[in-house]
Amino acid sequence: MSSYSELSNLPIREIPGDYGFPIISAIKDRYDYFYNQGEDAWFHNKAEKYKSTVVKINMAPGPFTSNDYKLVAFLDANSFVCMFDNSLIDKTDTLGGTFKPGKEYYSGYRPVAFIDTKDPNHAALKGYILSAFAKRHNLFIPLFRNSLSDHLFNNLEKQVTEQGKSDFNALLPTMTFNFIFRLLCDQTNPSDTVLGAQGPEHLRKWLFPQLIPSLSAKKLPNIIEDTLFHNFLIPFGFIKSDYNKLVDAFSKSAVSILDEAEKLGIKREEAVQNILFLVGINMFAGLNAFSPHLFRFVGEAGASLHTQLAKEIRTVIKEEGGAITLSAINKMSLVKSVVYETLRLRPPVPLQYGKAKKDFMVQSHDASYKINKGQFVVGYQPMASRDPKIFANPDEFVPDRFMNDGEKMLKHVLWSNGRETENPAPDNKQCPGKDLVHLLGRLILVEFFMRYDTFTVEITPLFRAPNVAFKTLTKASK
Protein backbone atom coordinates (compact mmCIF):
# COMPACT_ATOMS: atom_id res chain seq x y z
CA MET A 1 0.00 0.00 0.00
CA SER A 2 1.26 3.48 -0.82
CA SER A 3 1.93 5.65 2.21
CA TYR A 4 2.26 9.39 2.05
CA SER A 5 4.93 11.16 4.08
CA GLU A 6 3.71 14.30 5.81
CA LEU A 7 7.21 15.27 6.94
CA SER A 8 8.34 18.42 5.19
CA ASN A 9 10.37 21.57 5.70
CA LEU A 10 8.19 23.45 3.24
CA PRO A 11 6.39 26.57 4.45
CA ILE A 12 2.81 26.08 5.62
CA ARG A 13 0.30 27.98 3.51
CA GLU A 14 -3.45 28.48 3.63
CA ILE A 15 -5.18 26.69 0.76
CA PRO A 16 -5.90 29.39 -1.84
CA GLY A 17 -9.08 29.63 -3.85
CA ASP A 18 -12.61 30.91 -3.51
CA TYR A 19 -15.90 29.03 -3.65
CA GLY A 20 -17.66 32.30 -4.49
CA PHE A 21 -21.38 32.89 -4.23
CA PRO A 22 -23.54 29.90 -3.28
CA ILE A 23 -24.90 28.00 -6.30
CA ILE A 24 -24.23 30.85 -8.80
CA SER A 25 -20.44 30.53 -8.72
CA ALA A 26 -20.65 26.75 -8.86
CA ILE A 27 -22.86 26.87 -11.96
CA LYS A 28 -20.46 29.33 -13.62
CA ASP A 29 -17.57 27.00 -12.83
CA ARG A 30 -19.53 24.12 -14.34
CA TYR A 31 -20.05 26.00 -17.62
CA ASP A 32 -16.38 26.94 -17.73
CA TYR A 33 -15.37 23.33 -17.01
CA PHE A 34 -17.58 21.71 -19.63
CA TYR A 35 -18.03 24.37 -22.30
CA ASN A 36 -16.14 27.67 -22.07
CA GLN A 37 -12.66 26.39 -21.20
CA GLY A 38 -12.65 22.59 -21.12
CA GLU A 39 -11.34 20.30 -18.42
CA ASP A 40 -7.59 20.72 -18.95
CA ALA A 41 -7.68 24.49 -19.33
CA TRP A 42 -10.05 24.88 -16.38
CA PHE A 43 -7.70 23.14 -13.94
CA HIS A 44 -4.63 24.88 -15.37
CA ASN A 45 -6.37 28.26 -15.08
CA LYS A 46 -7.22 27.61 -11.43
CA ALA A 47 -3.60 26.77 -10.65
CA GLU A 48 -2.38 29.83 -12.54
CA LYS A 49 -4.92 32.17 -10.96
CA TYR A 50 -4.03 31.19 -7.40
CA LYS A 51 -0.33 30.45 -8.05
CA SER A 52 -0.77 27.07 -6.41
CA THR A 53 -1.28 23.43 -7.36
CA VAL A 54 -3.38 22.85 -4.24
CA VAL A 55 -6.55 24.93 -4.60
CA LYS A 56 -10.17 25.21 -3.54
CA ILE A 57 -12.62 24.54 -6.37
CA ASN A 58 -16.30 24.11 -7.12
CA MET A 59 -16.21 20.70 -8.77
CA ALA A 60 -18.57 19.91 -11.64
CA PRO A 61 -21.34 18.94 -11.99
CA GLY A 62 -22.24 20.76 -8.76
CA PRO A 63 -25.81 21.99 -8.22
CA PHE A 64 -28.25 20.33 -8.31
CA THR A 65 -26.79 16.90 -8.88
CA SER A 66 -24.75 17.20 -5.69
CA ASN A 67 -24.84 19.26 -2.51
CA ASP A 68 -21.19 18.49 -1.73
CA TYR A 69 -19.14 20.12 -4.47
CA LYS A 70 -16.73 22.39 -2.56
CA LEU A 71 -13.51 20.47 -2.96
CA VAL A 72 -9.76 20.87 -2.62
CA ALA A 73 -7.88 19.88 -5.78
CA PHE A 74 -4.38 18.37 -6.03
CA LEU A 75 -2.77 19.37 -9.32
CA ASP A 76 0.87 18.27 -9.08
CA ALA A 77 2.67 14.95 -8.66
CA ASN A 78 3.62 15.54 -5.01
CA SER A 79 0.18 16.34 -3.69
CA PHE A 80 -1.69 13.93 -5.98
CA VAL A 81 -0.12 10.76 -4.59
CA CYS A 82 -1.70 11.29 -1.17
CA MET A 83 -4.84 9.98 -2.89
CA PHE A 84 -3.28 6.50 -2.83
CA ASP A 85 -2.77 6.39 0.95
CA ASN A 86 -5.60 4.37 2.49
CA SER A 87 -4.82 5.72 5.95
CA LEU A 88 -5.56 9.27 4.77
CA ILE A 89 -8.24 9.01 2.08
CA ASP A 90 -11.66 7.37 2.33
CA LYS A 91 -12.96 6.21 -1.08
CA THR A 92 -16.49 5.29 0.07
CA ASP A 93 -18.97 6.22 -2.67
CA THR A 94 -16.57 8.71 -4.26
CA LEU A 95 -15.74 6.84 -7.46
CA GLY A 96 -17.99 9.00 -9.63
CA GLY A 97 -17.03 12.20 -7.89
CA THR A 98 -19.50 14.46 -6.15
CA PHE A 99 -22.51 12.33 -7.13
CA LYS A 100 -23.14 8.61 -6.92
CA PRO A 101 -25.40 6.30 -8.94
CA GLY A 102 -28.35 4.88 -7.04
CA LYS A 103 -28.04 1.37 -5.64
CA GLU A 104 -30.69 0.21 -8.10
CA TYR A 105 -27.97 0.24 -10.79
CA TYR A 106 -26.43 -2.71 -8.94
CA SER A 107 -29.52 -4.42 -7.47
CA GLY A 108 -28.90 -2.88 -4.07
CA TYR A 109 -25.25 -3.93 -3.85
CA ARG A 110 -22.19 -1.68 -3.87
CA PRO A 111 -19.40 -3.03 -6.13
CA VAL A 112 -15.92 -3.09 -4.65
CA ALA A 113 -14.90 0.11 -6.47
CA PHE A 114 -17.46 2.06 -4.42
CA ILE A 115 -16.29 0.86 -1.00
CA ASP A 116 -13.25 1.80 1.05
CA THR A 117 -10.49 -0.59 2.08
CA LYS A 118 -11.74 -0.40 5.68
CA ASP A 119 -15.02 -2.04 4.62
CA PRO A 120 -14.96 -5.72 5.69
CA ASN A 121 -16.14 -6.78 2.20
CA HIS A 122 -13.37 -4.99 0.32
CA ALA A 123 -10.57 -7.52 0.65
CA ALA A 124 -12.83 -10.46 -0.24
CA LEU A 125 -14.32 -8.79 -3.33
CA LYS A 126 -11.03 -7.35 -4.61
CA GLY A 127 -9.26 -10.66 -3.99
CA TYR A 128 -11.99 -12.47 -5.91
CA ILE A 129 -11.58 -10.21 -8.95
CA LEU A 130 -7.79 -10.52 -8.92
CA SER A 131 -8.09 -14.30 -8.64
CA ALA A 132 -10.57 -14.42 -11.53
CA PHE A 133 -8.14 -12.53 -13.76
CA ALA A 134 -5.21 -14.73 -12.73
CA LYS A 135 -7.12 -17.92 -13.59
CA ARG A 136 -7.86 -16.60 -17.08
CA HIS A 137 -4.49 -15.11 -17.98
CA ASN A 138 -3.84 -17.75 -20.66
CA LEU A 139 -6.95 -16.53 -22.51
CA PHE A 140 -5.99 -12.85 -22.69
CA ILE A 141 -3.89 -13.01 -25.86
CA PRO A 142 -5.83 -15.53 -28.00
CA LEU A 143 -9.25 -14.07 -27.23
CA PHE A 144 -8.14 -10.48 -27.79
CA ARG A 145 -6.41 -11.38 -31.05
CA ASN A 146 -9.59 -13.06 -32.30
CA SER A 147 -11.68 -10.04 -31.37
CA LEU A 148 -9.24 -7.66 -33.04
CA SER A 149 -9.34 -9.65 -36.26
CA ASP A 150 -13.06 -10.39 -36.38
CA HIS A 151 -14.47 -7.11 -35.09
CA LEU A 152 -11.88 -4.37 -35.69
CA PHE A 153 -9.09 -4.67 -38.23
CA ASN A 154 -11.01 -6.48 -40.98
CA ASN A 155 -13.81 -3.91 -40.79
CA LEU A 156 -11.33 -1.04 -40.52
CA GLU A 157 -9.53 -2.09 -43.68
CA LYS A 158 -12.76 -2.73 -45.57
CA GLN A 159 -14.18 0.70 -44.74
CA VAL A 160 -10.97 2.54 -45.64
CA THR A 161 -10.88 0.70 -48.98
CA GLU A 162 -14.54 1.16 -49.84
CA GLN A 163 -15.35 4.51 -48.21
CA GLY A 164 -11.98 6.25 -47.97
CA LYS A 165 -12.29 6.55 -44.20
CA SER A 166 -13.10 4.39 -41.18
CA ASP A 167 -14.42 5.54 -37.80
CA PHE A 168 -12.18 3.73 -35.31
CA ASN A 169 -14.27 4.78 -32.31
CA ALA A 170 -17.43 3.33 -33.83
CA LEU A 171 -15.80 -0.09 -34.31
CA LEU A 172 -14.23 -0.31 -30.86
CA PRO A 173 -17.29 -1.09 -28.68
CA THR A 174 -18.21 -4.32 -30.48
CA MET A 175 -14.62 -5.52 -30.39
CA THR A 176 -14.07 -4.73 -26.71
CA PHE A 177 -17.42 -6.11 -25.58
CA ASN A 178 -16.94 -9.34 -27.50
CA PHE A 179 -13.52 -9.85 -25.91
CA ILE A 180 -14.65 -9.03 -22.38
CA PHE A 181 -17.78 -11.17 -22.53
CA ARG A 182 -15.96 -14.20 -23.91
CA LEU A 183 -13.17 -13.81 -21.36
CA LEU A 184 -15.48 -13.78 -18.35
CA CYS A 185 -18.30 -15.97 -19.68
CA ASP A 186 -16.58 -19.25 -20.51
CA GLN A 187 -15.92 -18.11 -24.09
CA THR A 188 -19.63 -17.74 -24.83
CA ASN A 189 -20.40 -15.41 -27.73
CA PRO A 190 -22.60 -12.55 -26.51
CA SER A 191 -24.69 -12.89 -29.67
CA ASP A 192 -25.80 -16.32 -28.41
CA THR A 193 -27.41 -14.77 -25.32
CA VAL A 194 -30.43 -12.56 -24.69
CA LEU A 195 -28.20 -9.63 -25.69
CA GLY A 196 -27.98 -10.72 -29.32
CA ALA A 197 -25.94 -8.24 -31.35
CA GLN A 198 -26.92 -5.37 -29.04
CA GLY A 199 -24.61 -6.12 -26.12
CA PRO A 200 -22.47 -2.97 -26.50
CA GLU A 201 -25.59 -0.82 -26.88
CA HIS A 202 -27.25 -2.24 -23.75
CA LEU A 203 -24.01 -1.67 -21.84
CA ARG A 204 -23.65 1.90 -23.08
CA LYS A 205 -27.23 2.71 -22.12
CA TRP A 206 -26.66 1.34 -18.62
CA LEU A 207 -23.41 3.30 -18.27
CA PHE A 208 -24.74 6.58 -19.66
CA PRO A 209 -26.71 7.82 -16.60
CA GLN A 210 -23.82 6.84 -14.33
CA LEU A 211 -21.18 8.75 -16.30
CA ILE A 212 -22.88 11.66 -18.09
CA PRO A 213 -23.13 13.99 -15.04
CA SER A 214 -19.33 14.29 -15.13
CA LEU A 215 -18.98 14.43 -18.91
CA SER A 216 -20.01 16.44 -21.95
CA ALA A 217 -21.34 14.47 -24.91
CA LYS A 218 -21.01 17.49 -27.25
CA LYS A 219 -24.07 16.38 -29.19
CA LEU A 220 -26.61 18.94 -27.98
CA PRO A 221 -26.59 22.73 -27.53
CA ASN A 222 -24.77 23.50 -24.28
CA ILE A 223 -27.75 24.84 -22.38
CA ILE A 224 -29.90 21.84 -23.28
CA GLU A 225 -27.21 19.30 -22.42
CA ASP A 226 -26.44 21.05 -19.15
CA THR A 227 -30.09 21.27 -18.14
CA LEU A 228 -30.82 17.63 -18.93
CA PHE A 229 -27.66 15.91 -17.71
CA HIS A 230 -25.84 18.10 -15.18
CA ASN A 231 -28.70 19.35 -13.03
CA PHE A 232 -30.50 16.08 -12.37
CA LEU A 233 -29.69 12.38 -12.27
CA ILE A 234 -31.42 10.33 -14.96
CA PRO A 235 -34.01 7.99 -13.42
CA PHE A 236 -33.03 4.33 -13.42
CA GLY A 237 -36.33 3.39 -15.05
CA PHE A 238 -35.12 4.66 -18.42
CA ILE A 239 -32.48 1.93 -18.64
CA LYS A 240 -33.99 -0.78 -16.44
CA SER A 241 -34.71 -3.14 -19.34
CA ASP A 242 -31.12 -2.82 -20.63
CA TYR A 243 -29.78 -3.54 -17.16
CA ASN A 244 -32.02 -6.58 -16.74
CA LYS A 245 -30.78 -8.06 -20.01
CA LEU A 246 -27.15 -7.55 -18.96
CA VAL A 247 -27.77 -9.21 -15.60
CA ASP A 248 -29.57 -12.10 -17.28
CA ALA A 249 -26.77 -12.64 -19.80
CA PHE A 250 -23.95 -12.59 -17.25
CA SER A 251 -25.88 -14.62 -14.68
CA LYS A 252 -26.44 -17.42 -17.20
CA SER A 253 -23.15 -17.26 -19.09
CA ALA A 254 -20.48 -16.46 -16.47
CA VAL A 255 -20.98 -19.83 -14.78
CA SER A 256 -17.37 -20.60 -13.84
CA ILE A 257 -16.53 -17.18 -12.46
CA LEU A 258 -19.74 -17.12 -10.40
CA ASP A 259 -19.04 -20.60 -9.07
CA GLU A 260 -15.64 -19.30 -7.94
CA ALA A 261 -17.36 -16.50 -6.03
CA GLU A 262 -19.63 -18.89 -4.15
CA LYS A 263 -16.63 -21.02 -3.13
CA LEU A 264 -15.17 -17.85 -1.57
CA GLY A 265 -18.37 -17.14 0.34
CA ILE A 266 -19.55 -14.33 -1.95
CA LYS A 267 -23.21 -14.35 -2.92
CA ARG A 268 -23.80 -15.13 -6.57
CA GLU A 269 -25.99 -12.05 -7.01
CA GLU A 270 -23.32 -9.80 -5.51
CA ALA A 271 -20.67 -11.35 -7.73
CA VAL A 272 -22.80 -10.62 -10.81
CA GLN A 273 -22.95 -6.93 -9.87
CA ASN A 274 -19.19 -6.75 -9.36
CA ILE A 275 -18.59 -8.48 -12.69
CA LEU A 276 -20.97 -6.09 -14.42
CA PHE A 277 -19.11 -3.12 -12.95
CA LEU A 278 -15.78 -4.66 -13.95
CA VAL A 279 -17.04 -5.19 -17.48
CA GLY A 280 -18.66 -1.78 -17.85
CA ILE A 281 -16.40 0.69 -16.08
CA ASN A 282 -13.00 -0.96 -15.69
CA MET A 283 -12.79 -2.67 -19.06
CA PHE A 284 -15.36 -1.49 -21.63
CA ALA A 285 -15.30 2.23 -20.79
CA GLY A 286 -11.58 2.15 -20.01
CA LEU A 287 -10.48 0.48 -23.25
CA ASN A 288 -12.81 2.60 -25.37
CA ALA A 289 -11.34 5.75 -23.80
CA PHE A 290 -7.69 4.66 -23.96
CA SER A 291 -7.46 3.11 -27.45
CA PRO A 292 -8.36 6.27 -29.44
CA HIS A 293 -5.63 8.19 -27.61
CA LEU A 294 -3.12 5.44 -28.39
CA PHE A 295 -3.80 5.57 -32.12
CA ARG A 296 -4.06 9.34 -32.09
CA PHE A 297 -0.56 9.71 -30.62
CA VAL A 298 0.99 6.99 -32.76
CA GLY A 299 -0.82 8.23 -35.84
CA GLU A 300 0.24 11.85 -35.39
CA ALA A 301 3.85 10.79 -34.69
CA GLY A 302 4.06 9.69 -38.32
CA ALA A 303 5.86 7.16 -40.48
CA SER A 304 9.18 7.31 -38.64
CA LEU A 305 7.69 5.93 -35.43
CA HIS A 306 5.58 3.46 -37.42
CA THR A 307 8.74 2.09 -39.03
CA GLN A 308 10.46 1.72 -35.66
CA LEU A 309 7.47 -0.04 -34.11
CA ALA A 310 7.01 -2.37 -37.07
CA LYS A 311 10.70 -3.27 -37.07
CA GLU A 312 10.79 -4.03 -33.34
CA ILE A 313 7.57 -6.03 -33.42
CA ARG A 314 8.40 -8.10 -36.50
CA THR A 315 11.98 -8.75 -35.42
CA VAL A 316 10.94 -10.08 -32.02
CA ILE A 317 8.11 -12.18 -33.45
CA LYS A 318 10.48 -13.70 -36.01
CA GLU A 319 12.99 -14.52 -33.28
CA GLU A 320 10.18 -16.19 -31.32
CA GLY A 321 9.38 -18.49 -34.22
CA GLY A 322 6.46 -16.43 -35.50
CA ALA A 323 4.35 -16.76 -32.36
CA ILE A 324 2.76 -13.79 -30.61
CA THR A 325 3.26 -14.71 -26.97
CA LEU A 326 3.51 -12.85 -23.68
CA SER A 327 7.23 -13.57 -23.62
CA ALA A 328 7.62 -11.99 -27.05
CA ILE A 329 5.51 -8.94 -26.19
CA ASN A 330 7.53 -8.36 -23.02
CA LYS A 331 10.69 -8.02 -25.13
CA MET A 332 9.29 -5.07 -27.12
CA SER A 333 10.67 -2.10 -25.19
CA LEU A 334 9.50 0.63 -27.60
CA VAL A 335 5.97 -0.79 -27.74
CA LYS A 336 5.91 -0.90 -23.95
CA SER A 337 7.13 2.70 -23.69
CA VAL A 338 4.55 3.97 -26.19
CA VAL A 339 1.72 2.48 -24.15
CA TYR A 340 3.08 3.88 -20.88
CA GLU A 341 3.48 7.30 -22.48
CA THR A 342 -0.12 7.24 -23.69
CA LEU A 343 -1.35 6.27 -20.22
CA ARG A 344 0.77 9.07 -18.74
CA LEU A 345 -0.59 11.74 -21.04
CA ARG A 346 -4.20 10.58 -21.16
CA PRO A 347 -5.20 8.30 -18.29
CA PRO A 348 -8.56 6.60 -18.91
CA VAL A 349 -9.88 7.85 -15.55
CA PRO A 350 -8.46 11.37 -15.09
CA LEU A 351 -10.00 12.21 -11.70
CA GLN A 352 -9.50 10.54 -8.32
CA TYR A 353 -11.82 11.45 -5.47
CA GLY A 354 -11.97 10.82 -1.74
CA LYS A 355 -12.57 12.31 1.68
CA ALA A 356 -9.97 12.92 4.36
CA LYS A 357 -10.12 10.30 7.12
CA LYS A 358 -8.25 12.64 9.48
CA ASP A 359 -6.44 15.96 9.57
CA PHE A 360 -3.20 15.75 7.61
CA MET A 361 -0.63 17.89 5.81
CA VAL A 362 -0.30 17.64 2.05
CA GLN A 363 2.74 18.93 0.16
CA SER A 364 3.03 20.42 -3.28
CA HIS A 365 6.51 21.21 -4.59
CA ASP A 366 6.44 24.61 -2.91
CA ALA A 367 4.35 24.49 0.26
CA SER A 368 2.46 22.41 2.82
CA TYR A 369 -1.30 22.67 3.34
CA LYS A 370 -3.57 21.38 6.07
CA ILE A 371 -6.41 19.12 4.93
CA ASN A 372 -9.16 18.85 7.53
CA LYS A 373 -10.91 15.61 8.40
CA GLY A 374 -13.98 15.12 6.18
CA GLN A 375 -12.72 17.45 3.43
CA PHE A 376 -13.75 16.26 -0.04
CA VAL A 377 -10.63 16.18 -2.25
CA VAL A 378 -9.90 15.46 -5.89
CA GLY A 379 -6.72 14.82 -7.84
CA TYR A 380 -6.55 15.73 -11.52
CA GLN A 381 -4.21 13.12 -12.89
CA PRO A 382 -3.30 14.62 -16.30
CA MET A 383 -1.65 17.55 -14.48
CA ALA A 384 0.03 15.30 -11.92
CA SER A 385 1.48 13.01 -14.58
CA ARG A 386 2.52 15.97 -16.75
CA ASP A 387 4.19 17.77 -13.88
CA PRO A 388 7.04 19.87 -15.38
CA LYS A 389 9.08 19.39 -12.20
CA ILE A 390 9.02 15.62 -12.79
CA PHE A 391 9.05 15.17 -16.58
CA ALA A 392 10.99 16.98 -19.30
CA ASN A 393 8.73 18.16 -22.12
CA PRO A 394 5.77 16.98 -20.05
CA ASP A 395 3.03 17.82 -22.56
CA GLU A 396 4.77 16.14 -25.50
CA PHE A 397 4.29 12.56 -26.65
CA VAL A 398 7.80 11.08 -26.38
CA PRO A 399 7.59 7.47 -27.61
CA ASP A 400 10.84 6.26 -26.03
CA ARG A 401 10.43 8.15 -22.73
CA PHE A 402 10.30 4.96 -20.66
CA MET A 403 13.02 2.98 -22.42
CA ASN A 404 16.36 2.11 -20.79
CA ASP A 405 17.08 4.58 -17.95
CA GLY A 406 13.63 6.06 -18.50
CA GLU A 407 12.11 3.04 -16.74
CA LYS A 408 12.97 4.65 -13.41
CA MET A 409 10.30 7.27 -14.17
CA LEU A 410 7.51 4.68 -14.17
CA LYS A 411 6.83 5.43 -10.52
CA HIS A 412 5.36 8.73 -11.74
CA VAL A 413 2.88 7.00 -14.09
CA LEU A 414 -0.29 7.07 -12.00
CA TRP A 415 -3.18 6.11 -14.27
CA SER A 416 -4.24 2.98 -12.34
CA ASN A 417 -5.05 4.70 -9.02
CA GLY A 418 -1.58 3.76 -7.89
CA ARG A 419 2.01 3.99 -9.06
CA GLU A 420 2.96 1.90 -12.10
CA THR A 421 5.68 0.29 -9.98
CA GLU A 422 3.09 -1.03 -7.51
CA ASN A 423 0.52 -3.79 -7.91
CA PRO A 424 -3.21 -4.10 -7.22
CA ALA A 425 -3.95 -6.06 -4.05
CA PRO A 426 -6.95 -6.83 -1.82
CA ASP A 427 -5.89 -4.09 0.61
CA ASN A 428 -5.54 -1.22 -1.88
CA LYS A 429 -7.66 0.67 -4.41
CA GLN A 430 -5.41 0.18 -7.42
CA CYS A 431 -7.25 -0.92 -10.57
CA PRO A 432 -7.49 -4.74 -10.69
CA GLY A 433 -7.14 -4.61 -14.49
CA LYS A 434 -3.90 -2.58 -14.41
CA ASP A 435 -1.66 -5.21 -16.01
CA LEU A 436 -4.34 -6.37 -18.43
CA VAL A 437 -4.90 -2.86 -19.81
CA HIS A 438 -1.19 -2.42 -20.47
CA LEU A 439 -0.97 -5.85 -22.09
CA LEU A 440 -3.94 -5.15 -24.37
CA GLY A 441 -2.50 -1.77 -25.32
CA ARG A 442 0.70 -3.48 -26.42
CA LEU A 443 -1.12 -6.33 -28.13
CA ILE A 444 -3.27 -4.03 -30.26
CA LEU A 445 -0.08 -2.33 -31.53
CA VAL A 446 1.58 -5.69 -32.19
CA GLU A 447 -1.38 -6.98 -34.18
CA PHE A 448 -1.70 -3.71 -36.06
CA PHE A 449 1.94 -3.46 -37.14
CA MET A 450 2.09 -7.11 -38.11
CA ARG A 451 -0.60 -6.17 -40.66
CA TYR A 452 0.37 -2.62 -41.67
CA ASP A 453 3.48 -0.54 -42.28
CA THR A 454 1.96 2.88 -41.71
CA PHE A 455 -1.32 4.79 -41.57
CA THR A 456 -2.82 8.26 -41.41
CA VAL A 457 -5.63 9.49 -39.20
CA GLU A 458 -8.04 12.39 -38.90
CA ILE A 459 -8.61 13.57 -35.32
CA THR A 460 -11.75 15.26 -34.01
CA PRO A 461 -11.38 16.51 -30.41
CA LEU A 462 -14.12 15.52 -27.97
CA PHE A 463 -14.48 16.17 -24.24
CA ARG A 464 -11.93 13.53 -23.25
CA ALA A 465 -11.21 10.82 -25.82
CA PRO A 466 -10.76 12.06 -29.41
CA ASN A 467 -12.61 10.59 -32.34
CA VAL A 468 -10.11 8.84 -34.60
CA ALA A 469 -10.85 8.24 -38.27
CA PHE A 470 -8.38 6.16 -40.28
CA LYS A 471 -7.83 7.66 -43.74
CA THR A 472 -5.11 5.40 -45.16
CA LEU A 473 -3.66 1.99 -44.34
CA THR A 474 -0.48 0.70 -45.97
CA LYS A 475 -0.27 -3.08 -45.80
CA ALA A 476 2.86 -4.66 -44.39
CA SER A 477 5.62 -5.04 -46.96
CA LYS A 478 6.88 -8.56 -47.53
Curated annotation (Swiss-Prot):
Involved in the biosynthesis of the anti-fungal and antibacterial toxins colneleate and colnelenate. Can use (9S)-hydroperoxy-(10E,12Z)-octadecadienoate (9-HPOD) and (9S)-hydroperoxy-(10E,12Z,15Z)-octadecatrienoate (9-HPOT) as substrates but has no activity with the corresponding 13-hydroperoxides (13-HPOD and 13-HPOT). Expressed in roots. The keyword Iron applies. Transmembrane segments: none annotated. It comes from the Eukaryota. Keywords: Heme, Iron, Lyase, Metal-binding. Heme binds at residue 431. This is Divinyl ether synthase CYP74D2.
